[in-house]
Curated annotation (Swiss-Prot):
Enzyme class: transferase
Protein name: Phosphoenolpyruvate guanylyltransferase 1
Function: Guanylyltransferase that catalyzes the activation of phosphoenolpyruvate (PEP) as enolpyruvoyl-2-diphospho-5'-guanosine, via the condensation of PEP with GTP. It is involved in the biosynthesis of coenzyme F420, a hydride carrier cofactor.
Catalytic activity, EC: 2.7.7.105
Stretches of the chain forming a coiled coil according to its record: none
PANTHER family noted in UniProt: 2-PHOSPHO-L-LACTATE GUANYLYLTRANSFERASE (PTHR40392:SF1)
Annotated GO MF terms: GTP binding; phospholactate guanylyltransferase activity
Source superkingdom: Bacteria
């Protein structure tokens, strides 16, 4: 059987998303940017040949509407939080991790033999070729991780064995937690995949690589309103 992957993208409630950009953007502008980066991320992964499905895991109705509008599935019900998750992560992160785990199990029940990927939602510089290469590298065995450009976070987590749970451990310092739990690091040169956006410096780094059309349009609109808020090209 040809390789097949289902991508899960978790998104917090918009009012809680990208708070580290609050010194640069107000809530409305930050929300618009989050949705634009999500739109670009979904567009790229949906066009990768071996991706057979994309599901957005979110409690937020606006995020769910966007996901459905571009053909993605939505897993809207937060999963129960287990006691084991509590020591390592804050409330929002452990709730999303539980929901990701439940969504991964749901996908595998309905799509036998599919690889499962948990991908960040804020990858405006992602290229399809990068993601395809990372998928191919992940398929050489088990559970694996792409560490972000800071070396501390997780850009993508892969489970390419139906007997191995996804076991997401997103949140601050997630790269270490994923590696310590047995995920192997994937070392490819994939700058767009590794550049998730949490801060103004991250946004500058993404713009230097080149961002997708929805993100570009959002940033152009913000720059027109106030050029000082959008960083350097």
């Amino acid at each position: 059987m040809a390789p097949r992957a289902h991508v899960l993208v978790a998104v917090k409630e918009l009012h809680a998303a990208k708070t580290r950009l609050s010194s640069v953007f107000d809530t409305a502008d930050r929300t618009g940017l989050v949705l634009s980066m999500l739109r670009d991320t979904l567009a790229v992964v949906s066009d990768v040949a071996t991706v057979v499905g994309v599901t957005v895991v979110t409690p937020d109705p606006a995020v769910a509407r966007l996901a459905r509008s571009v053909g993605a599935h939505v897993y809207a019900d937060p999963a129960p939080v287990s006691a084991e998750d509590r020591p390592d992560e804050g409330g929002t992160e452990h709730s999303l991790n539980a929901a990701l785990s439940a969504a991964a199990e749901h996908v595998r029940r309905n799509e036998r033999g599919v690889d499962v990927v948990a991908l960040q939602a804020d990858l405006p510089s992602l290229r399809g070729g990068e993601f395809g290469e990372a998928l191919a590298a992940a398929r050489t065995g088990g559970r694996s991780v792409v560490v972000d450009h800071h070396g501390t976070g997780t850009a993508a987590l892969f489970s390419c064995d139906p007997e191995i749970p996804l076991d997401p451990r997103f949140g601050p310092g997630s790269a270490k937690r994923h590696l310590e739990s047995g995920a192997r690091p994937l070392d490819g040169h994939w700058p767009g995949l590794r550049t998730d956006v949490d801060t103004a410096d991250d946004l500058d780094a993404a713009q230097a690589l080149g961002v997708g059309p929805a993100t570009r349009a959002a940033l152009d609109a913000l720059e027109h309103t106030d050029p000082s808020r959008c960083g350097n090209e």
